[in-house]
UniProtKB/Swiss-Prot annotation:
Keywords: Methyltransferase, S-adenosyl-L-methionine, Transferase. It comes from Clarkia breweri (Fairy fans). The active site is at H272 (proton acceptor). This is (Iso)eugenol O-methyltransferase. The gene is IEMT1. GO terms for molecular function: (iso)eugenol O-methyltransferase activity; protein dimerization activity. It catalyses: (E)-isoeugenol + S-adenosyl-L-methionine = (E)-isomethyleugenol + S-adenosyl-L-homocysteine + H(+). Residues 1-2 form a propeptide. GO terms for biological process: methylation. Its EC number is 2.1.1.146. It comes from the Eukaryota.
Length: 368
């Protein structure tokens, strides 16, 4: 045996940064555990149970949560503790330690600030359905084809399913409902903020929400501006699940063939699904459907020119990667790229009017 002074058996990094780099590499290698653990917690309604069972800044034990689940599994509290411990390490939930009479230390958990958006708000919506959409098996499969798409060309989603994402929705009713719920929930939260920040809907008579899903956004616009008549325009298999809303007409069709006429056309999170060529075709259809004083209101992320490590930038870059995996030419764009699309489509004016939860509201104006 060597002595403790023998340098050959000392485990000391050559540089302190080596330790950090190794840990970062290990974290990246296991990074998939976070969204999948959060997915399980959401599917089990763990966060909703916590929201209903404890006061703000309060705590609850895994055993108390497990008692409210439809399970007889004696290991459920221990398994929940391990899931919640993971979520606590990422500040999704908070924790405190409690010493039991036996001397054992028990972890108790509470809701962290992010849970405001992962549990139902006063409107009954949260971002939980959006997370369930993003982690659905249908949307995980294309990632296994990204390498092939880079080497051979094509779109990972198409390679996985033999068709584009939008056509696939019409073949899978389960996933179509999951997707619509996820998009509707996300839209409702973001749109509520947009309506607080942006006043460009004032004075309109008719607005067309292109790619409006099941009509949640159109209904919110009409609720704030009752004098507006709204047309919710999307593919037929999308609006088949759309509920009736006062002041909203659902129309099925293909936006690349044409769009309904209105004083203004609203397009939220649509351009990033498509290539520049597709966007130009859509925007030219919008231009033709508008009166001389009309405008297209575009709500999208704006891609920063540099990949800085801020959360806001990471969200945009994450979404750009999703577009790379799923959509035909879809991508996030810089402000200059949006302005170029507007000008190339015939619009004379362009401005960034507002921002809500990282979604920028831009106006493409027929007259400058």
């Amino acid at each position: 045996m060597g002595s403790t002074g023998n340098a050959e058996i000392q485990i000391i990094p050559t540089h302190s940064s080596d330790e950090e780099a190794n840990l970062f590499a290990m974290q990246l290698a296991s990074a998939a555990v976070l969204p999948m653990a959060l997915k399980a917690a959401i599917e089990l309604d763990v966060l909703e149970i916590m929201a209903k069972s404890v006061p703000p800044s309060g705590y609850i034990s895994p055993a108390e949560i497990a008692a409210q689940l439809p399970t007889t599994n004696p290991e459920a509290p221990v398994m929940l503790d391990r899931v919640l411990r993971l979520l606590a390490s990422y500040s999704v939930v908070t924790y405190t330690l409690r010493e039991l009479p036996s001397g054992k230390v028990e972890r108790l958990y509470g809701l962290a600030p992010v849970c405001k958006f992962l549990t139902k708000n006063e409107d009954g919506v949260s971002l939980a359905p959006f997370l369930l959409t993003a982690t659905d098996k249908v949307l995980l499969e294309p990632w296994f084809y990204l390498k092939d798409a880079i080497l051979e060309g094509g779109i990972p989603f198409n390679k996985a399913y033999g068709m584009n994402e939008f056509d696939y929705h019409g073949t899978d009713h389960r996933f179509n409902k999951v997707f619509n719920k996820g998009m509707s929930s996300n839209s409702t939260i973001t749109m509520k903020k947009i309506l607080e920040m942006y006043n460009g809907f004032e004075g309109l008579t008719t607005i067309v929400d292109v790619g409006g899903g099941t009509g949640a956004v159109a209904s919110m616009i009409v609720a704030k501006y009752p004098s507006i008549n709204a047309i919710n325009f999307d593919l037929p298999h999308v609006i088949q699940d759309a509920p009736a809303f006062s002041g909203v007409e659902h129309l099925g069709g293909d936006m690349f063939d044409g769009v309904p006429k209105g004083d203004a056309i609203f397009i939220k999170w649509i351009c990033h699904d498509w290539s520049d060529e597709h966007c130009l075709k859509l925007l030219k259809n919008c231009y033709a459907a508008l009166p001389d004083h009309g405008k297209v209101i575009v709500a999208e992320y704006i891609l920063p020119p540099s990949p800085d490590p801020s959360i806001a930038t990471k969200v945009v870059i994450h979404t750009d990667a999703l577009m790379l995996a799923y959509n035909p030419g879809g991508k996030e764009r810089t402000e200059k790229e949006f302005q170029a699309l507007a000008m190339a489509s015939g619009f004379r004016g362009f401005k960034v009017a507002s921002c809500a939860f990282n979604t920028y509201v831009m106006e493409f104006l027929k007259t400058a």
